[in-house]
Amino acid sequence: MPQLTVGSAIEKATSLLETAGVPTHEAETTARCIVASDRWGIGSHGLMRLPFYLARLQAGGINPTAQLKTVTDLPSLVVFDGDDGLGHWQLQKAAELASERAMVNGVAAVGVGRSNHCGALGIYVWPMINRGLVGIAFSTGPAVKLPWGGNKAL
């Protein structure tokens, strides 16, 4: 039985994303985040999602060549427009910038709007923790769950 190594999983996912039109750097960053989810035991946000992303790219629901556009840029606050791109590489870039700004300013918040699914959020916070920072990541999505005792999805 063939075995899938971490390296080969990243290479294959990167290749599939590139074939769908995603530039190499963004494709590899996305692939690394996806595979990291599986390595962390969060399979619901790992490689099983790749066919969904590829289908959305093919259907035009995700912009393969999206560019982060700066909406607001203050010392401790940056807001990007994600241009309907893949959330993984966009959140990775946002987390890196938040870390850099927090190291200089003591605190920082970076937001990305008009993006897509970004996978497991802990992937973006872990590098912050390794730098001695407190990181918080959150995301929005459609109302799909009822709160306990509720009658309307929030």
Residue ranges and their predicted role:
Residues 109-154:
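Glycine-rich anion/phosphate-binding loop at the beta-strand->alpha-helix junction
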Residues 70-73, 102-104, 129, 152-154:
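Solvent-exposed alpha-helices and their adjacent loops that cap or buttress functional pockets
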Residues 22-29, 44-46:
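Flexible, glycine/charged-enriched surface loops at secondary-structure junctions
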Residues 1-20:
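Generic N-terminal amphipathic, Lys/Arg-enriched alpha-helix
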Residues 79-83, 108-113:
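Short glycine-rich or small-residue beta-strand-to-loop segments that form or flank ligand, phosphate
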Residues 46-101:
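Active-site cofactor/substrate anionic-group-binding motifs, chiefly glycine-
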Residues 18-21, 36, 40-43:
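N-terminal and secondary-structure boundary signal
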